[in-house]
Every structure is written in C-alpha cells, then in structure tokens.
A protein has these predicted regions:
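A mid-sequence, solvent-exposed acidic-amphipathic segment
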Residues: 135-190, 195
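Conserved active-site alpha-helix within GNAT-family acetyltransferase domains
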Residues: 93-107, 207, 230-248
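Conserved beta-strand-loop-alpha-helix junction that forms the acyl-donor binding cleft
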Residues: 89-96, 226-236, 252-261
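Short amphipathic alpha-helix that is part of the acyltransferase structural core
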Residues: 1-23, 117-152
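Conserved acetyl-CoA-binding loop-helix of GNAT-fold acetyltransferases
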Residues: 69-81, 196, 202-218, 236-241
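Conserved donor-binding loop and adjoining core beta-sheet/short helix segment
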Residues: 26-79, 177-192
Length: 261
C-alpha cells in the first residue's frame, strides 16, 4: 500500500537504517524544513518499507529516491503525482522509471561522504579571515553565487541556520562554505553551497571556510555528510583532507515532463 507519511518518528526510525544515505530525510524532519516536505511511503503489513521525499523549499523541487528492493515499485506508484520539473537524487538504474513521462538532463554520478573528524592539527586552528555570514549580507551572497556557482541550491532562508562562513576581501565575498541541511534536534548536518570566486581559487580559501564550518558543527552535531561529484578531484581532495570518507555513489539529474502536441 502506498500513502503519504507525516509521522516524524516513523520517518526517523526508517531513515536511521542508513544515516548518511538518508541524511536529507533526517535533517528535513526539523521544523525548519519539514513544512516543505512531502513523504511517500510504501507499506507492507503496516510496516514502512520504502520512502521517497519531495522537497519543495527551493525554487525548483528536489526528489530523493533512495531505498531498497521495492523502491522502483514505489516510484512507479507516485510518478503521476510528481511536479512537471524537478531535480532528482536517485539510485543508479531508477532513471528508467521516469523516461516514459519525463525528459532527462543528466548531471552525473555523485558521491555521498561521511565525516570522521578533523585531523588533530586542524581541530583548533583558527582563521582570522573567515567570518560567519548573516542575512544582512544576502544581496552580496546571491551575487557571489550567481558569478561563482550559478547552479547552486542556495536559498536565502538557509542563512537562518547560522552555518554559513565566508572570506571577504575588499568588501567582496571570495569563498563560502555552508549547509544544505542542519538540525540540532536530529543531530545531523549536510554541507553544501561550497564555492570560491574564480579569481581566488588555488589559495586555500575553500579549505579555510570548510574547516571553520566543521569546527562550528562539531560542537553541536554528531553526523555530518556531504555530496560531491565523483570527477571533482579538487573538491574530493579537500573533503578527504578535512576528515570525510566515501559512503556510496548515487546519480543526479533534472527531469522535465514531456510535452505532447
């Protein structure tokens, strides 16, 4: 049986089966994000066996399709309820479920990574040039991302988390590290929207911002993850240097409903 799910405890205990695979699911249970979520569940003898999340808090919705042996069945059951266009994170092979109704723009294979802790020499290192960013700087931050990371998932409400750090030189933002998900209640965070201005790359600014962000998160959060494209070698080196290890691979794409005339 397929039905929408709103029971936070049920969703949480299901998602704990693989905390880093379902990191967004867990973090989005926080009241800060939950009102933007639609959860589709597959039940077998009243037991939740599969779960798909549609997050509508961004300009373009994002669908998260990860699961187990019956996830394809659940996806087929809900496909007529999905938006006309959305980003999708999914297990390899599930793209075929969309192709009869949607056009696909494939973004490639990505890697989920999990945090094991900063190396000892970085745990207490401080960077005077890296500061916390606030909502007062929204305009400058949006301008920075438009130039440096136009495909970012950043929305200004994310600054309310207090987990965005940046380097500013001559009144211009040069680098930012932030979060996609952050919940003290559910003890989880997912790093994201990490970028550096083209003119400042190779100077270690992203590393500085990521370390500063992790130092802040370590005091509050037990489980920290991130997503990165598998062929982004520079980013992979940065994350490995700052305490992340691979967890599993998945795919990303943009889907747009086919138009028939």
């Amino acid at each position: 049986m397929v039905q929408k799910v709103s029971d936070k405890q049920l969703i949480y205990y299901f998602s704990k089966k693989d905390i880093y695979l379902f990191a967004y699911h867990i973090g989005d249970l926080d009241d800060f994000f939950f009102h933007n979520c639609t959860w589709y569940g597959l039940f077998d003898n009243d037991q939740l066996t599969e779960l798909i999340l549609l997050f509508s808090g961004l300009s373009t919705p994002t669908l998260l399709v990860f699961g187990f042996s019956k996830i394809s069945m659940l996806l087929d059951e809900i496909i007529d309820d999905l938006p006309d266009r959305f980003y999708c994170h999914y297990t390899k092979g599930l793209e075929k479920n969309f192709l009869s109704k949607y056009e696909m723009d494939y973004f490639g294979t990505h890697l989920k990574m999990k945090y094991q802790g900063l190396p000892k020499e970085l745990r207490v290192k401080k960077f005077s040039n890296c500061t916390q960013l606030t909502e007062k700087q929204t305009g400058e931050i949006l301008t920075f991302y438009e130039k440096s990371y136009p495909n970012t998932y950043f929305e200004s409400f994310m600054l309310k988390t207090g987990k965005y750090y940046g380097i500013i030189e001559n009144n211009l933002i040069k680098s930012i590290a932030g979060v996609h998900v952050y919940s003290k209640k559910y003890n989880i965070a997912v790093l994201g929207n990490i970028a550096t201005d083209l003119s400042s790359r190779g100077l270690g600014y992203a590393t500085t911002c990521v370390i500063t962000l992790l130092q802040s998160l370590e005091a509050e959060i037990k489980h920290i993850g991130l997503n990165v494209k598998v062929d982004n070698i520079a980013a992979l080196k940065l994350y490995q240097k700052t305490g992340f290890v691979p967890h599993l691979e998945y795919e990303e794409a943009f889907f747009k409903k086919k138009q028939y005339f």
